[in-house]
Amino acid sequence: YDICACLVGSEMCIRDSPTGRLNIQRMERLCKTLSDLKNAGHEIILVSSGAIAMGFGKLNLRERPHDMPTKQASAAVGQCELMYVYDKLFTEYNHTVAQLLITAPDIADGGSRKANFHNTMDRLLELGALPVINENDTVSTEEIAVGDNDTLSAIVAATVSADLLVLLSDIDGLYDGDPRKNPDAKLIPTVETVDERIIALGGGSGSSLGTGGMATKLLAAQIAVGAGCEMVIANGEKPELLYDIVAGKPIGTRFLVKR
């Protein structure tokens, strides 16, 4: 894979507690693994959630905010902290990070904004930088209300013609039933076509820290695969699994591109 995009859900960055504090060990392992993959010749793009969750931790709020102004204030504080952490960790491995905060209209249309984003991304990769992308949560209301870095990451992957998109969250992959209700539900290792039957499996599994569930991940798969980009849904508890995912090994659920 030449260009690999990786989405990190909020639950990857933040400890699953009311405090919204950073999961330092997991973030360190993630950045080390991505740095090593970059050293091995893969272009890496990171789409990272976690600004709101990190912000309410830093603001010492007792729980995730529910009203829009507090969410957006949390995002403003948390985004600084998030980038500080990524900059610090990637710098240890001699990689330079670049922050890109975008909203859906920036990359949704075929106009000059999308072309501008594409050109900037191309140049950053040429210069050897590692782009870290998030929705611009302080001005973007729809994303926070609906919660959709899954779709954002797929649009980014499609825009830059990525070869692989990996969605890391607290979900192991796509199951043929709800594993929380049905212990016999089986993981589906590969999906060749994201059809109505597959979409129907995307009920509504979500995590407490983030805002996206399986339904948005399947929408992301449609966008990515439609643009010729393979996609994998995997559990990010062990970021080192990225080595096996990039090597094509059966981890999580892989959505294949028709060649």
Please provide the spans of the model-predicted regions.
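Polyanion-binding loop/helix "lid" in catalytic or ligand-binding cores
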Residues: M121, I133-I155, K186-L242
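Short beta-strand segments at enzyme active-site cores
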Residues: E43-G55, A98-Q99, V132-N134, L167-I171, ...
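Glycine-rich loop at the start of a catalytic domain that most often binds anionic cofactors/ligands
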Residues: A51-M68
